[in-house]
Amino acid sequence: MTLNQIILSLILGLSLMTTIIKSVPMDPTIYIEGTIFDQWPEYNYNFEKTNPGSNVKTLGMVKAKLNSTTKVPELSSDDTKTSPNTLGTMQYPELFKYHFTSNVDAPASKNSGKNLPMKIQFKLDQDNSGFYTFFNQTFFPIDNMGYDVDPSFRIYKQSGNYHNFHFCVKMNSRFTYNGGEVFNFKGDDDLWVYIDDKLVVDVGGIHPAQDGSVNLDTLGLIKNKVYPLDLFYCERHTDGSTISIQTTIQAYCAWYDYCGVCGGTGAVCCNAKANCDDGDLCTIDSCPQPNLAFPDLQSVYKNCSHIPKDCPPANKCQVNSCDKTTGNCKPENLKCPDRSNECLKNTGCDDLTGCKYVSICTDSCDKKGNACVAGKCQQKTTSDCAAELDDNSCKVYSCNSTRGGCYSENKCKPDPTQICDVASCDDGACSIKTLPPDECNCGCKPNFCQKSNCVKNPSNNQFECSLLPADGIDDGNACTEDICDAVAQKITHVPYDTCKGCMSCNPSNGDCEAHNEVCNDFNACTENVCSPVKVGAGVGECVTTNTTCAPTTNVDKCKNYLCDSEKGCYETDVVCPDSGNCKVGHCDSKVGCSLKPRVCKSPAFCIVAECDETVGCIAFERRCASSNPKCKAGICVNGTTPEEGECESVNYDPKPFICQTGAIVSTAVIAGVTVAGAVALGIFIYGGKRGYDYWKESRSISMSSAVSSPMYVPSANASENPLYIPEGEL
């Protein structure tokens, strides 16, 4: 459960109470809270060092629009030679971001930007004129704290007295616009105030105390609407530090992190390197989300996150893993899977498509199409050979790789010792016919490669010898040359070598034909085709193209069209990344990824739900505007179904003097005014205008501020502070 949720439940419970409020006391005090960053000049040369001719109020140093994601100002230019950067002594623009963001883990070295964050609170008391004020002519809120816990850092002085002159303050608050509010500032050095992310007070640079103010009625704000108020203040140079704030803005904190810092990041009490290190170089250690609630700091540290380091491969032929000894991603070549059980042999890997293979079933008697069972190539059967050749029922088919593959023999054969027997076949049925002696005994003397054949001569009506090739010479395969050696009495069948590459001979007709299966690399992400190099040349080459998984029309831009080397094409949903915590990635099938504002829902009218870039959705009590801010307070009343809630205005109790109708100015008041006038006159006479100004600014003004950080403050009673981490051990 987040801290915000706990607070929300309490607020909601109170806000649902139906008690009618007729009057409320006026709040005499408001607090503006945030983070103060201790800056040591040796770590950031934007502090203490000055450019010739600077020492003046400098406008335009920062952009007029606050970065809505980081909630930290950005310089208008990174060029040190621009007038604002020169006059404002911004010698190292790249370090400006560390004026207002934590950089604890930077090395303790020159110009590293290292800083130390702590909690700070400004207490503003309401004076007699209705202004909430904070005034301090010697504003040194972190003396002996932060770096200066170590006495060796206490080297900067004012009139011989040590002070910490180098710090920056970041305060992110909210307020409900009533109308008529003003904000007045006087001090040194930098001060930038943003309202609704727009720069409204610009007092930049290293300089003596300077003024800046804004009347909120000039900003086009909407009454009763909640706006962010972001204040950024730096003290960058000796030997004075003055601050004066007068405002009628009733600023408040919407939420706190587990360190108790308003709108904090958790950096004040949790450092990932010091508090979350799990000793595993292959995990990314980080502190918990800052708006989570914990009973103590040890619980914070126990809930650190340790995310395994992501090491994505650079291509499909690489595996990338984290090296436990170095914490670096270590790429290695992919070991392609062993597919020998499929009769496949690996031939390498393609960066785009992955592992490639060839079939080992390439023998002329192996079945086509990589027929494989348990790693063994399947042989062609008589049926396979019959289909491959002429499929004649009067022939017997066999396969012999030495003979070039499939071949055939006549099914019906006569007894070679009976020269007058003639075999015949009819639809696979054999029959023997015995010829008359004069038709078969015609004086033939065949050799090994011949057989007797008697043919009747029409001229004399006698049978004469006409030898024929011996049975068995013709194997029925048009892709082999049939050779018979009568002397050696040997018949051979030599395959023709006319078809090359991925082309092979058709045994039924002897033509060279392209065979795509020869080119198959058994990668489902490629298309393999055998293409003739030249028409009629009998030579083919394999052409491989990568498979296109995306459709040619109506492409869904919210789908990733991917390919797996074994499974082929598949789809995954596009994950549109968020931008910060308040812009949610959204996908439209027509246009793809875009960003939408995160919607934070409120459970009741008197609860404001909105998105904060630091943590996401937050909820806080609605502060209502007043119809008469000087005399009445705005209060929120939740509605009951179906009525909505509303804001109302009720009288302050007791009523301010100005709100008392027909009030009589008493002698006590007159006496008070007279005494005050006498005091002022006396100060003016004996102290001069400077003394009078000091008295005028300081009367009825509290000079209170509070700073704390359990990590950077030593124990007050000289015992060991378990949360204090000495410099150099972070």
UniProtKB/Swiss-Prot annotation:
The chain crosses the membrane at residues 668-688. It comes from the Eukaryota. Pfam families: PA14 (PF07691). One of its GO terms (cellular component) is extracellular region. InterPro entries: Fibro_Slime, PA14/GLEYA, PA14_dom, Prespore-cell_inducing_factor. It is found in: Membrane. Residues 689-730 are cytoplasmic. The keyword Signal applies. Glycans are attached at residues 67, 136, 303, 400, 546, 638. Residues 1-23 form the signal peptide. Keywords: Glycoprotein, Membrane, Signal, Transmembrane, Transmembrane helix. Residues 24-667 are extracellular. Residues 125-265 form the PA14 domain. PROSITE patterns: PA14. The keyword Glycoprotein applies. It is a single-pass type I membrane protein. NCBIfam families: Fibro_Slime (TIGR02148). Belongs to the prespore-cell-inducing factor family. This is Protein psiL. The gene is psiL.
